[in-house]
């Protein structure tokens, strides 16, 4: 016969765990909304920056512009920037980004290229420190909600210096693209050299909305507004090439920030999903334990009645 006290203790433990998972789910949902607000708040600056760069490129299209950030070289060594999480309890988020990174590194090895890793997040650091892949730099406790003094500027500085010095010929970014609350996509993107033809492409923003008593993600395409080109007789106080060289690092910083925000939203959405599943499992387990407890209690009462009746008959 099951121990009634043991079952009661287990039911109490499951209820406490369920409270924790529900709270973590709500916290993750609130942080996804905050990440959404950060993306929308930074969008006007990014739009104007891209628009200005597009106009400068159009003005300089007939000139031989040699910006060091757009210089394409024979790729011999690649710096791979990997953005993962600092904590667990977020489903397969960290394992997916690590798996995609390892796959990409194997591809570089097959091509005979050298590489080094720039790891962001404790989970990626702990995994790759146990591997044989070379690590150039690590960064933890990243907060993408501080765009001016935050990690995006630090990361940009860390990848710009070795690229401009020729230590690395290319910088690749591996991050998690936020698709929906139940879906994310590990993505590989070239950060450096910058592609001038990609400046006018479409971008997307995400918005967390409530629907049917739950949460849903609405993604919206944002067409970059390309303002009218500079007039042919426009006089610049500085050389347009110098302006381009000054604005390109800002564009790179905004790209890094965007990747941090997408990765952060993906991690939080994965944590929401994981905690929601844990809460549902706890509910099912409570139902099962309650049935077991009631059956055990009923059997115990029946046994006591039988003992009383047997004693009376004796």
From Swiss-Prot:
<comment type="function">
    <text>Produces ATP from ADP in the presence of a proton gradient across the membrane. The gamma chain is believed to be important in regulating ATPase activity and the flow of protons through the CF(0) complex.</text>
</comment>
<dbReference type="InterPro" id="IPR000131">
    <property type="entry name" value="ATP_synth_F1_gsu"/>
</dbReference>
<comment type="similarity">
    <text>Belongs to the ATPase gamma chain family.</text>
</comment>
<dbReference type="Pfam" id="PF00231">
    <property type="entry name" value="ATP-synt"/>
</dbReference>
<dbReference type="InterPro" id="IPR035968">
    <property type="entry name" value="ATP_synth_F1_ATPase_gsu"/>
</dbReference>
<dbReference type="GO" id="GO:0042777">
    <property type="term" value="P:proton motive force-driven plasma membrane ATP synthesis"/>
</dbReference>
<protein>
    <recommendedName>
        <fullName>ATP synthase gamma chain</fullName>
    </recommendedName>
</protein>
<keyword id="KW-0472">Membrane</keyword>
<dbReference type="GO" id="GO:0045259">
    <property type="term" value="C:proton-transporting ATP synthase complex"/>
</dbReference>
<dbReference type="GO" id="GO:0046933">
    <property type="term" value="F:proton-transporting ATP synthase activity, rotational mechanism"/>
</dbReference>
<keyword id="KW-0813">Transport</keyword>
<keyword id="KW-0406">Ion transport</keyword>
<keyword id="KW-0139">CF(1)</keyword>
<dbReference type="GO" id="GO:0005886">
    <property type="term" value="C:plasma membrane"/>
</dbReference>
<keyword id="KW-0997">Cell inner membrane</keyword>
<dbReference type="GO" id="GO:0005524">
    <property type="term" value="F:ATP binding"/>
</dbReference>
<keyword id="KW-1003">Cell membrane</keyword>
<dbReference type="InterPro" id="IPR023632">
    <property type="entry name" value="ATP_synth_F1_gsu_CS"/>
</dbReference>
<comment type="subunit">
    <text>F-type ATPases have 2 components, CF(1) - the catalytic core - and CF(0) - the membrane proton channel. CF(1) has five subunits: alpha(3), beta(3), gamma(1), delta(1), epsilon(1). CF(0) has three main subunits: a, b and c.</text>
</comment>
<dbReference type="GO" id="GO:0015986">
    <property type="term" value="P:proton motive force-driven ATP synthesis"/>
</dbReference>
<keyword id="KW-0375">Hydrogen ion transport</keyword>
<keyword id="KW-0066">ATP synthesis</keyword>
């Amino acid at each position: 016969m099951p121990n009634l006290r043991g079952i009661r203790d287990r039911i109490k433990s499951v209820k406490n765990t369920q409270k924790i998972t529900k709270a973590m789910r709500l916290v993750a949902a609130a942080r996804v909304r905050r990440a959404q607000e950060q993306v929308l708040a930074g969008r006007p600056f990014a739009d104007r920056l891209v628009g200005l760069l597009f106009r400068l490129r159009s003005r300089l299209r007939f000139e031989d512009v040699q910006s060091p950030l757009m210089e394409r070289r024979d790729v011999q060594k690649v710096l791979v920037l990997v953005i993962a999480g600092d904590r667990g309890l977020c489903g397969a988020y960290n394992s997916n980004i690590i798996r995609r990174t390892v796959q990409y590194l194997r591809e570089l090895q097959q091509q005979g290229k050298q590489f080094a890793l720039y790891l962001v997040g404790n989970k990626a650091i702990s995994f790759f420190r146990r591997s044989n892949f070379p690590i150039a730099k690590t960064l933890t406790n990243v907060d993408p909600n501080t765009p001016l003094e935050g990690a995006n500027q630090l990361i940009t500085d860390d990848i710009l210096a070795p690229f401009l010095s020729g230590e690395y010929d290319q910088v690749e970014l591996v991050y998690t693209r936020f698709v929906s609350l139940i879906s994310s996509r590990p993505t590989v993107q070239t950060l450096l050299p910058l592609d001038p033809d990609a400046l006018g492409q479409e971008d997307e923003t995400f918005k967390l909305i409530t629907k049917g008593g739950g949460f849903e993600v609405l993604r919206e395409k944002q067409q970059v507004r390309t303002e009218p080109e500079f007039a042919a007789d426009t006089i610049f106080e500085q050389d347009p090439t110098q302006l381009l060289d000054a604005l390109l690092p800002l564009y790179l910083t905004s790209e890094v920030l965007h990747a941090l925000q997408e990765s952060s939203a993906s991690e939080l959405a994965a944590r929401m999903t994981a905690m929601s599943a844990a809460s549902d499992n706890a509910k099912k387990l409570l139902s099962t334990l309650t049935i077991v407890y009631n059956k055990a209690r009923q059997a115990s009462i029946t046994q006591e009645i039988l003992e009383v009746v047997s004693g009376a008959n004796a």
